[in-house]
Amino acid sequence: MSEKLQKVLARAGHGSRREIESIIEAGRVSVDGKIAKLGDRVEVTPGLKIRIDGHLISVRESAEQICRVLAYYKPEGELCTRNDPEGRPTVFDRLPKLRGARWIAVGRLDVNTCGLLLFTTDGELANRLMHPSREVEREYAVRVFGQVDDAKLRDLSRGVQLEDGPAAFKTIKFSGGEGINQWYNVTLTEGRNREVRRLWEAVGVQVSRLIRVRYGDIPLPKGLPRGGWTELDLAQTNYLRELVELPPETSSKVAVEKDRRRMKANQIRRAVKRHSQVSGGRRSGGRNNNG
């Protein structure tokens, strides 16, 4: 069964459909040696050869590809990019290796923000979850420094003007602290760059700590170490798919046996420890990555 080329490439994680359409229009995609045109359809078969900028890429039939989703505890100091020219650690460094697929980040967190970051092998799922029209809730725990009064909280709820347009928190809830150091839990339904920090700064308050604790109804897993990941089970994966009107999966690669879960947890802890040691050695090796 043939499918639109941009749909096949989006599913394989090579960008959103709109991004891929631009790549196709620029003549950067070829199918079996011929430059592709927007609107082309392909049938995914073992002999199909699709190249982007001359590089052969791997694609699979929709029925063959199992949608996988990871919940990752991003530490502060990691970049949301696949490769950094300065050799700084990235969120992809510790993820499990894949064959015939790749992990796609669902949105981004800035370098000084930690917490929940979802990854998936399904490009269409990632793009829909990120799109503002879906209004998927993101919840953050925020420690702020500065005087917070009722007027400022009203402004943050009703909306303030940022350089890229108006913005507001959907909910704001005080969660502890005294004096000018206080914690709040806030929610947004979009993911603009540094939006949480910029909203608080717009009312004269600085953010000193920022942790994403929930994406949709998926919380940051309890007990997950910083730099650790866990794979969502079938029910959680299908919750996310239903949330953005994608058909459910019927199978999962998550092991259900307790012994295998325990083994995986131990492997994650060892990977976190090993990566921390490597990162520490990299930073002390004479290259200054703090600039």
UniProtKB/Swiss-Prot annotation:
InterPro entries (alphabetical): PsdUridine_synth_cat_dom_sf, PsdUridine_synth_RsuA/RluA, PsdUridine_synth_RsuA/RluB/E/F, PsdUridine_synth_RsuA/RluB_CS, RsuA_PseudoU_synthase, S4_RNA-bd, S4_RNA-bd_sf
Active-site residues, Swiss-Prot/TrEMBL:
110
Keyword list, A-Z = Isomerase, RNA-binding, rRNA processing
Q: Name one GO biological process term.
A: enzyme-directed rRNA pseudouridine synthesis
Q: Which PANTHER family match?
A: PSEUDOURIDINE SYNTHASE FAMILY PROTEIN-RELATED, RIBOSOMAL LARGE SUBUNIT PSEUDOURIDINE SYNTHASE B
What does the UniProt function comment say about this protein? Answer: Responsible for synthesis of pseudouridine from uracil-2605 in 23S ribosomal RNA.
Protein name stated in the entry: Ribosomal large subunit pseudouridine synthase B
Q: Which organism is it from?
A: Escherichia coli (strain K12)
Point out the gene that encodes the protein.
rluB
